Every structure is written in C-alpha cells, then in structure tokens.
Amino acid sequence: MEQIQNNRVMTDLYRENAQFPGIALDGSDVYLCWQRFVDRHDSLMASCRRGDEVVWEREISDGGEVLHPVILAHGGAIWYAWSEYARENWRILARCYRDGQWGEVLT
C-alpha cells in the first residue's frame, strides 16, 4: 500500500460544510463519501479521485436529511450506506457503484 505523501483538500469550506468522511480504495481509484451541509440540508456526496484528478463527484442520497455515511469497496463494487430522515421517518439506505453505473437506492 502506498503512503500518501501530501494532504489534499477535498471540499471547499466556503461553499459547504462537510463531516463524517469515508474512504475506500479500488486499484488506483480513491472513492470518498461525506455528509454535506448546504442551505440547512444534509446530503450524501460521493467522489472518485485518480491521483490529483477528480474523475466524478455527485450527490447520491435520496432527498432526506443524511447522517453518518459509510463506504466499502468489495469485488469491484463500491457500496455506500447511510441513515436518512424523510417524511418523519428514519431509514437505512444503500447504493452501489459498479462498472461506471449507479444502482438504485435500496432501503
């Protein structure tokens, strides 16, 4: 496993607040997730980095208020799971990213 030589800034504190980061490695790709807070709303962000390049970055949550996301790389798939509050209920959701495609949000 390579040692990371330099710190990298992944979010812009003037644009959004970020907490509860997660990281998973798959080959040379680095997958990240974090809880983003913008305009009084928490959402789940996911990102793929290759070296200094941002391959993609997007919101992957289901519209509710997100809490404590986790991430796992296994068998060529990247799995994200999180708690989400919507319509006066908490639920646990999951979503898979594999071969450049996103699966549906699972409950």
Model-inferred region functions:
Residues 1-107:
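Extracellular, repeat-based ectodomains that mediate carbohydrate processing or recognition
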